[in-house]
Amino acid sequence: MAHKKGTGSTRNGRDSNAQRLGVKRFGGEVVKAGYILVRQRGTKFHPGVNVARGGDDTLFATIAGVVTFERYGKNRKRVSVYPLEG
């Protein structure tokens, strides 16, 4: 027999809220300046052409244009925004 009180359910029951990270605008999408492209922790994606990085590593567009995801270097990815022609 157990000589200590089972305290499983009273000591559990906590969880943190989801951080809602991830890609918010995908390749080929047309965006305006200021649109958030990727929410991330660290630099899973690096900022490319016409993309800036916020204080929490969020990537956002600095001009209106089309989003592209590119590989550069051996194992890095970057997000760029190129202006629309026309």
Swiss-Prot record:
GO terms for cellular component: cytosolic large ribosomal subunit. It comes from the Bacteria. Keywords: Ribonucleoprotein, Ribosomal protein. Residues 7-19 have a biased composition (Polar residues). Residues 1-21 are annotated as: Disordered. One of its GO terms (biological process) is translation. The keyword Ribosomal protein applies. InterPro entries: Ribosomal_bL27, Ribosomal_bL27_CS. One of its GO terms (molecular function) is structural constituent of ribosome. NCBIfam families: L27. HAMAP family: Ribosomal_bL27. Belongs to the bacterial ribosomal protein bL27 family. This is Large ribosomal subunit protein bL27. It comes from Thermosynechococcus vestitus (strain NIES-2133 / IAM M-273 / BP-1). The gene is rpmA.
